[in-house]
């Protein structure tokens, strides 16, 4: 673990910074408004999605619950997975995703990942983030910031090689 006592960067507006950094990382952010319907917002971002997985009761647009599958290979072909983030980091737009599913592949195998995040649960930097998870007991967790991307020796950028092609964070 890094030295968490260091003075790290603090932002005047964590929400604004988070959104800007997420966009720079190739992700999308949407701030829910009081009149918004969460399922309609998801459908607006992913109108062509046929296979939407989620174990969250409020996600009525889900076509299946990944926890009910017998084999994680059945997740292959998932267009969108909808998950809850525990908190976000303004510094790098990373969201802490503790394992809330039977199979952790849910976070990586779908073409797109929608992360629901309480906008009040933003920290400034990774020092604050590590302090939040240091004493917690997680079987698995991952920080995710934007879509998966990699580049080869010729610097050809490829999205979705090791995870979702698109990541949308819906700030509630």
Give the positions of each predicted feature.
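The feature marks the mature, well-folded catalytic cores of soluble enzymes
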Residues: 1-172
């Amino acid at each position: 673990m890094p030295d968490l006592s260091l003075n790290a960067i603090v932002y005047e507006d964590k929400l604004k910074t988070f959104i800007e950094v997420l966009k720079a990382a190739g992700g999308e952010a949407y701030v829910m408004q009081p009149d918004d319907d969460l399922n309609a917002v998801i459908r607006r971002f992913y109108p062509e999605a046929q296979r939407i997985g989620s174990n969250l009761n409020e996600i009525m647009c889900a076509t299946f619950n990944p926890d009910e599958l017998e084999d994680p290979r059945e997740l292959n072909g998932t267009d969108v997975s909808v998950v809850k983030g525990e908190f976000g980091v303004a510094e790098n737009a990373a969201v802490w995703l503790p394992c809330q599913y039977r199979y952790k592949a849910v976070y990586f195998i779908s073409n797109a990942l929608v992360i629901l995040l309480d906008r009040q649960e933003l920290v400034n930097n990774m020092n604050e983030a590590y302090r939040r998870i240091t004493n917690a007991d997680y079987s698995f967790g991952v920080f995710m910031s934007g879509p998966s991307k990699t580049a080869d020796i010729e610097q050809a950028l490829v999205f979705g090689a090791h995870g979702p092609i698109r990541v949308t964070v819906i700030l509630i």
